[in-house]
Design a protein with these regions (language model features):
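Catalytic core of the metallo-beta-lactamase
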Residues: 46-108
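Generic marker of "main functional regions" within proteins
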Residues: 11-14, 20, 72, 80-83, ...
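Surface-exposed beta-strand edges and their flanking turn/coil or helix-capping segments
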Residues: 19, 25-26, 83-86, 108-110, ...
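Residues that form ligand- and interface-recognition hot spots within folded domains
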Residues: 14, 87, 187
């Protein structure tokens, strides 16, 4: 947060200030730092202001003109919010923040199942495209082409059940060809989108969604082997490893 000048307000979701402020060292148990908020206005959007519904997310029209919405997406942390920015009259970018941390946490789904052929992707260990059947048979823990590869671990989120619900809501946006879903730790964005101050309004025209949708499968280990039958419950799932 200190990247931005103190004149930049910090906008947070419901319950954030009570949970995290003051920061450390004033509050030794806080996960935030006092320096993050020093001289800065912290604006918490109350739950009552999320009076719209976009998809299944309670939403707040930030500027009042339909150009940018904050979405109440609790679970990962108290007050976690996502952003939905209009890029053209009919297209949007969904900024998922920490609702997910890897594409395999919310893809594939019944809305967008694994395709027959997954195209080549940057950082891919496959050296080119990959048959969807290989991913289902050799990589996916449940051998299922319509459920995500990963499930969030219990204890990782502030509220595990809420976090899973927020992911379910995000998946519905991800299935829309007019919405580009971006999450904070998605390395597949690098090389597929331009850096600021360039714009991303023409993402659909450039085919960005198609380029990144399955790029995350390039993280999986080609030498993966499924645990023997009957050992799945106790298996070490390091075989579903991600590149660092």
């Amino acid at each position: 947060m200190t990247t931005f000048p103190a004149s930049t307000d910090l906008v947070v979701g419901p319950g954030f200030q009570k949970e995290y402020l003051p920061g450390y060292p004033t509050n030794p148990t806080s996960a935030m730092l006092d320096s993050d908020f020093s001289g800065r206005t912290v604006r918490e959007i109350p739950e009552s202001d999320f009076s719209l519904m976009i998809g299944r997310f309670p939403a707040f029209d930030y500027f009042g003109d339909g150009s940018f919405y904050l979405l109440h997406a609790p679970g990962h942390t108290v007050g976690h919010i996502c952003g939905l920015a209009r890029t053209t009259p009919n297209t949007f970018i969904f900024m998922g923040g920490d609702a997910c941390h890897h594409g395999g946490e919310f893809r594939p789904t019944e809305y967008i199942p694994l395709p027959k052929d997954v195209p080549a992707a940057p950082r891919s260990r496959f050296g080119g495209g990959c048959p969807g059947s290989f991913l289902v048979e050799k990589i996916h823990p449940q051998s299922n082409g319509t459920t995500p590869f990963y499930d969030i671990a219990k204890g990782f989120s502030h509220d595990h059940d809420e976090a899973k619900r927020s992911i379910g809501k995000l998946q519905e946006f991800d299935a829309n060809d007019d919405v580009l879903v971006c999450i904070s730790h998605d390395q597949t964005m690098v090389g597929n989108v331009d850096f600021y101050p360039k714009t991303i309004n023409d993402w659909k025209e450039k085919g960005v969604q198609k380029s990144i949708r399955w790029a995350f499968v390039g993280d999986f280990d080609l030498k993966a082997e499924r645990p023997p039958p009957g050992e799945a419950e106790e298996a070490d799932y390091s075989w579903l490893s991600a590149a660092k």
